[in-house]
């Protein structure tokens, strides 16, 4: 028999984690002052008047480097729970994690050879 009461803590945290940000945004919307003037609408740059254009173009190398970083950051998110419960899961999950890491290594070698990790 599948027992639903085991998930009560999960549902409580889920409801609370959805409710608190909604409540915070609602309260700040009611309490925030509404004064829109020319000074309020101007851009702020370290307390002085902005110099030059506000629009800046980044090079494509930055985006490639950031994308590779995000991929390996997500890898850490997936591997951390596996590492914490390694002794319980057994050898089959170890093989799956090994395949996952090997795919990521192949991807990093591919990105390296394509020059995505070079900044010059």
Swiss-Prot record:
Catalysed reaction per UniProt?
A: a plastoquinone + NADH + (n+1) H(+)(in) = a plastoquinol + NAD(+) + n H(+)(out); a plastoquinone + NADPH + (n+1) H(+)(in) = a plastoquinol + NADP(+) + n H(+)(out)
Question: Recorded GO terms, molecular function?
Answer: NADH dehydrogenase (ubiquinone) activity; quinone binding
Transmembrane portions of the chain = 9-29, 64-84, 88-108
* A Pfam family that the UniProt record links to this protein: Oxidored_q4
Which GO BP terms apply? photosynthesis, light reaction
- Return the GO cellular component terms, semicolon-separated: chloroplast thylakoid membrane; NADH dehydrogenase complex
Q: Which domain of life is it from?
A: Eukaryota
Keyword vocabulary terms for this entry: Chloroplast, Membrane, NAD, NADP, Plastid, Plastoquinone, Quinone, Thylakoid, Translocase, Transmembrane, Transmembrane helix, Transport
Matches recorded under Gene3D superfamilies: NADH:ubiquinone/plastoquinone oxidoreductase, chain 3
Q: What class of enzyme is it?
A: translocase
The record gives the membrane topology as: Multi-pass membrane protein
Q: Which InterPro entries match?
A: NAD(P)H_OxRDtase_bac/plastid, NADH_UbQ/plastoQ_OxRdtase_su3, NDAH_ubi_oxred_su3_sf
Cellular compartment(s): Plastid, Chloroplast thylakoid membrane
Q: What is its EC number?
A: 7.1.1.-
Family, per entry: Belongs to the complex I subunit 3 family.
Q: How does it assemble?
A: NDH is composed of at least 16 different subunits, 5 of which are encoded in the nucleus.
Q: What does this protein do?
A: NDH shuttles electrons from NAD(P)H:plastoquinone, via FMN and iron-sulfur (Fe-S) centers, to quinones in the photosynthetic chain and possibly in a chloroplast respiratory chain. The immediate electron acceptor for the enzyme in this species is believed to be plastoquinone. Couples the redox reaction to proton translocation, and thus conserves the redox energy in a proton gradient.
Q: Which HAMAP family match?
A: NDH1_NuoA
The protein's name is NAD(P)H-quinone oxidoreductase subunit 3, chloroplastic
């Amino acid at each position: 028999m599948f027992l639903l009461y085991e998930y009560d803590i999960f549902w409580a945290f889920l409801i609370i984690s959805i409710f608190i940000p909604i409540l915070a945004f609602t309260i700040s919307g009611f309490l925030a002052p509404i004064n829109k003037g020319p000074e309020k609408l101007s851009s702020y740059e370290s307390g002085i008047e902005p110099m030059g254009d506000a629009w800046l173009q980044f090079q494509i190398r930055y985006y490639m480097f950031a994308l590779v970083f995000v991929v390996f950051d997500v890898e850490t998110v997936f591997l951390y729970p596996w590492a914490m419960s390694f002794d319980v899961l057994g050898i089959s999950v170890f093989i799956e994690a090994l395949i996952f890491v090997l795919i990521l290594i192949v991807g990093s070698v591919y990105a390296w050879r394509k020059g995505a990790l070079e900044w010059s």
